[in-house]
């Protein structure tokens, strides 16, 4: 992904909520921390939940899995509803913003936008574009880039240098038309993880997150945040 490079966002609800507020999203839905994958910790997450973002390390093991998964889906096929809003990632370190766009775009009917919302405008203008066209559209969408840059400096840890290679990556897990989709702009298409519902989305998404952790048992750098009704 040569070309544009942004500063990475933290998987920190304060940062993501402030970012979305600046893009004109009404705070009737807010990101919250998921403190652990066990049922008693998941029970602390306010319901309903309409999306989960997972931050995870890109390791050699993961890259091997990603290649195998892609080849398997290409040979066996999968069902993906045309209702899924999916975009590719062409900007380095923009995965946090793309994860947020995926989370909001696939729950647009639940969201309230302020008048003149930058995010609402982006989603409306890109609704009929291909995933590749949406990626290009974001590259030239200065209002989102500037807001991302501001938010990247607002985290609890110091933002790395823009040239520093970052091996952490965000994906979004969302419910569309009765199925759980993993949306990752580094992948060629959405990944259908099977059936889900508004009521079981959090638990179903966390099962997918657990698989990421099981593939890399020596890694500790996993973090999940959930988009909950405020």
Curated annotation (Swiss-Prot):
Residues 8-13, 219-224 are annotated as: Interaction with ubiquitin. The record marks 89 as: Transition state stabilizer. Keywords: Cytoplasm, Hydrolase, Phosphoprotein, Protease, Thiol protease, Ubl conjugation pathway. GO terms for biological process: adult walking behavior; cellular response to insulin stimulus; eating behavior; positive regulation of fat cell differentiation; protein catabolic process; protein deubiquitination; retina development in camera-type eye; ubiquitin-dependent protein catabolic process. It comes from the Eukaryota. Pfam families: Peptidase_C12. Residues 5-229 form the UCH catalytic domain. Coiled coil: none annotated. InterPro entries: Papain-like_cys_pep_sf, Peptidase_C12_UCH, Peptidase_C12_UCH_sf, UCH_AS. The active site is at residues 95, 169. Inhibited by monoubiquitin and diubiquitin. The keyword Transcription regulation does not apply. It catalyses: Thiol-dependent hydrolysis of ester, thioester, amide, peptide and isopeptide bonds formed by the C-terminal Gly of ubiquitin (a 76-residue protein attached to proteins as an intracellular targeting signal). Its EC number is 3.4.19.12. GO terms for molecular function: cysteine-type deubiquitinase activity; deubiquitinase activity; peptidase activity. The record marks 184 as: Important for enzyme activity. It is found in: Cytoplasm. Residues 152-159 are annotated as: Interaction with ubiquitin. Crossover loop which restricts access of large ubiquitin adducts to the active site. The modification Phosphoserine is found at residue 130. Gene3D superfamilies: Peptidase C12, ubiquitin carboxyl-terminal hydrolase. Ubiquitously expressed, with highest levels in brain, liver, heart, thymus, kidney and testis. Highly expressed in the cauda epididymidis, in meiotic pachytene spermatocytes and post-meiotic spematids. In the retina, enriched in the photoreceptor inner segment. Disruption phenotype: Mice have no developmental defects, are fertile, and show normal T-cell differentiation. They have normal anxiety, locomotor behavior, motor function and synaptic transmission, but show defects in spatial learning and working memory. Exhibit stress-related effects with profound apoptosis-mediated germ cell loss and also, prominent retinal degeneration with photoreceptor cell apoptosis and mitochondrial oxidative stress. Mice show reduced capacity for adipocyte differentiation and impaired insulin responses. Preferentially binds diubiquitin; the interaction does not hydrolyze diubiquitin but, in vitro, inhibits the hydrolyzing activity on other substrates. Deubiquitinating enzyme (DUB) that controls levels of cellular ubiquitin through processing of ubiquitin precursors and ubiquitinated proteins. Thiol protease that recognizes and hydrolyzes a peptide bond at the C-terminal glycine of either ubiquitin or NEDD8. Has a 10-fold preference for Arg and Lys at position P3'', and exhibits a preference towards 'Lys-48'-linked ubiquitin chains. Deubiquitinates ENAC in apical compartments, thereby regulating apical membrane recycling. This is Ubiquitin carboxyl-terminal hydrolase isozyme L3. It comes from Mus musculus. The gene is Uchl3.
